[in-house]
Structure formats: structure tokens, C-alpha cells
Amino acid sequence: FEKKVLKDDELIFLAKKYKIIFDENAKKIYFDKDKIICQNKAKLDLFLRQNAKKIFTFYLKKWSKKTGLFYTHLSIKNMKTRWGSCNHNKAYINLNLKLIQKSLRAIEYVILHEISHLKFPNHSKEFYTFIEHFMSDFRQREKEFLS
């Protein structure tokens, strides 16, 4: 589980680093090249959580439909040692909020990985064969994700 050292005024969003500018007059959050401008930290945290939920839900629905494996609950948490987890008995998917720092390709891979645990609650050869059937470049995505 990697730790990138960021300055207090920096943020990574969808694999791109931004400098955070707090402006109490900013009515909305907006991006300006390599800057993200927002009113305060609470608004920024809400923005990140809302966007994580939208993106994660989009890919969960996509991969549920493609695989025929359906989850019952999504939880987005701050996790220290995992990017995601799956309770295959309850069909719960848990994703780390920090996953929003990764590329869409990486996010999509992690989501397919967790959805696949609904069928294979392990990391067996069959588990990886199942993933490869749906995402032939998953090993490349996994490398990108871990780098």
C-alpha cells in the first residue's frame, strides 16, 4: 500500500496532482489547469466523496451487468491497508476513498477485482481467469495501479 508524500496544499484526483486553493468566495469547486479552487476543506472533502460515489457506482453497475454478479451495498471508507474488500456472503463491496486518486483504468480494475470476489472469495487461478475473461489487460492495469 503506497504512500505518496504530498504537501498540505496538494491533492491527487483521478491520477493528476492539483494544488489546492481555498477561496472563501468560491461558490463552486472548479479546476484551473493544475489547481483546484474551493471554499474550504469540508466542501473539498464532500466533493471528493460525492465524485468517488458516482464513479465507483458507475463501474460497479457496469461490471455487475457484464459479469452477472450483483452487489447489495457499497461502502466508501478511509482504509489504511486496502484499496477494496468484498463480503461475498452479504454481497457488500467496500472501497477505499483514496481510490479516487487513481486513474479510471485502475479504479475499474479494482472494482472488477472486488465484484469477482462475489463468485470467488479467494485469489485462486479461477478467480484471475474470470477477471481476465472480462478484462484481458488486467495485469497491465494492476501494474499501473501499483506503480
Predicted regions and their residues:
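Active-site-proximal or metal-binding-adjacent scaffold patches in catalytic folds
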Residues: 1-109, 118-147
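Walker B catalytic acidic pair
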Residues: 114
